[in-house]
Amino acid sequence: MSLLQIQGLTASYDRSPVLHDVSLEVPQGGFIAVVGANTAGKSTLLRCVSGLLDKVSGSIVFDGHDILRLPPHRIPELGIAHVPEGRHVFPEMTVEENLYLGGYTRRRDGAALKRGCDEVYALFPRLLERRRQAAGTLSGGEQQMVAFGRALMLKPRLLLLDEPSHGLAPKVVEEMHQAMIDIHRSGLTILLVEQNTRLALSVAEHAYVLQSGAMVLSGPSRALMEDSRVREAYLGL
């Protein structure tokens, strides 16, 4: 059963088309990746799901309901959390204050928010040590953990991850890799877009290749890892 189904999605910025007739499915409990070059349109795809683009056509169906025309503030209320590229933490607020913002739809349940923070700290122990520290003073990797944890505070049904490894040190990339595996094992459905093809194919069950705004390949991640076109274009093999 598909939790998210995108069909014939076309999107543009002003008069510049970015996505062309894109279709994909994310099954309930699945881990799907979209890989491609830096200008392929991957981030635009997630922005469409989050309701952040106006010039779109096609259909985006979440749990049986078309959400293409919903305003952005309605998307998190449905259980869709988006970790954007660039982290976008609130620098003057503490780590814990940033996390609490992610749980705003449950803001009247203080006990649930506390449990949510504890779960994030279990996933990223480093954040527990820095919970009273201003987020703007953290390293890039730690800020990525805050952005990731803030999304999890929503208790989402679908997690959208936009280039979570971008600009991070190899050790932090390994931590993010393990975190993605752990939260997927807990039952969370994930749609990941990632330029690091090797990372994406190592964690996702199924993947799509986006090239110049169009889907050109799809299949089980293991099969794509062995596909000569993917190996040459994206894995440097």
Task: Report each predicted region and the residues it spans.
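ABC-type ATPase nucleotide-binding domains, specifically the catalytic core motifs of the NBD
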Residues: 14, 55, 70, 95-115, ...
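The feature captures the beta-strand-to-loop junction immediately N-terminal to the Walker
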Residues: 35-37
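Helix-to-loop junction immediately C-terminal to a conserved catalytic motif
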Residues: 50
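Conserved ABC ATPase signature
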Residues: 134-138
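Catalytic Walker B motif of ABC-type/P-loop ATPase nucleotide-binding domains
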Residues: 159-163
